[in-house]
Amino acid sequence: MPIDCKAKCGNKAALKRPKTGDALCKDCFFAAFEAEIHHTIVSSRLFRRGEKVAVAASGGKDSTVLAHVMKLLNERHDYGLDLVLLSIDEGITGYRDDSLETVKQNRDDYQMPLKILSYEELYGWTMDRIVAQIGRSNNCTFCGVFRRQALDRGAKLLGVDSIATGHNADDIAETVLMNILRGDTARLRRCTNIRTGGGEDSIPRVKPLKYSYEKEIVMYAHYKRLVYFSTECVFAPNAYRGHARAFLKDLEKVRPSVIMDIIYSGEQLRFKDTAKKPVRGICERCGFVSSQQPCKACVLLEGLNRGLPKLGIGKKSKGDRMIAQQNQELALRERANLVKNDF
């Protein structure tokens, strides 16, 4: 027998919220979900009136719900924001080409300007070609580095004040686990931050969905009948994040609140002052923000162009040795050709 909505609106409950366990009707769920995101935006002071904000759009559930809710809240609460969609085409046949059609549908549905940038035009490579050269073991490293910089480049072209990404609570909890497993204290410091970047030379990124459960995002998209692309990236199954995700799901079965517990724990972590912090600067080659010289994107790109795809994988010293070895081999070949020509 259907039970009453916990919000006491007079309707029968249609669902149970994964985050709170409350039985709600659809309308009360929508209201609660949207109100929580509004509270996150306001309490964290993510935006200021008059700002231009790029919504990172992939066509997936997270970015589609983010675009929908951002437009809704911007109008409902009069944020005074100028919203645009920014999408990156990685060049993955059978995945990104199809999802971009969904992004274009979002553009039409929400009446937002759309800018699409491709790896091909930015780097001269597509992910299909990169994977053909390097295999599937490190493809997510290349894609992640290039995508982050591509968003920065697109944001700069659009002249926006910030980039809103669709990272949800599950994503952030997974990232905390990944950084703990890797012993990466530098990233562990900032992975729970709702705002990253910013400053004189970079455009800040914000996460309005930071406290929104992935299951609730799916429910919201389903009951709102939003159009989104649900196919997983064809190169994703081998990603390291998948192991953290599976571990998190197992923990969630035992303790339903584990996602928020991990996020709150990550927010409260303290590190010794002696712990090494990355120093952010400007890449001497591309001119974008980086914590190393040259930046990771430029190193990876150099490796691809040199035929040394593993150049940017691992420690910098390893990459330096690979370049030195290649230069030595080239010098030996040139010397051999000179000797041959003398005869």
Swiss-Prot record:
Taxonomic superkingdom: Eukaryota
PANTHER family tied to this protein: ATPASES OF THE PP SUPERFAMILY-RELATED (PTHR11807), CYTOPLASMIC TRNA 2-THIOLATION PROTEIN 1 (PTHR11807:SF12)
Species annotation: Drosophila grimshawi (Hawaiian fruit fly)
Function: Plays a central role in 2-thiolation of mcm(5)S(2)U at tRNA wobble positions of tRNA(Lys), tRNA(Glu) and tRNA(Gln). Directly binds tRNAs and probably acts by catalyzing adenylation of tRNAs, an intermediate required for 2-thiolation. It is unclear whether it acts as a sulfurtransferase that transfers sulfur from thiocarboxylated URM1 onto the uridine of tRNAs at wobble position.
Keywords tagged on the record: Cytoplasm, RNA-binding, Transferase, tRNA processing, tRNA-binding
GO BP field: protein urmylation; tRNA thio-modification; tRNA wobble position uridine thiolation; tRNA wobble uridine modification
The protein's name in its UniProt record: Cytoplasmic tRNA 2-thiolation protein 1
Pathway of action: tRNA modification; 5-methoxycarbonylmethyl-2-thiouridine-tRNA biosynthesis
EC number: 2.7.7.-
Alphabetized HAMAP family for the sequence: CTU1 (MF_03053)
Record has Cytoplasm as a keyword: yes
Pfam family, one: ATP_bind_3
The UniProt record lists the keyword Transferase: yes
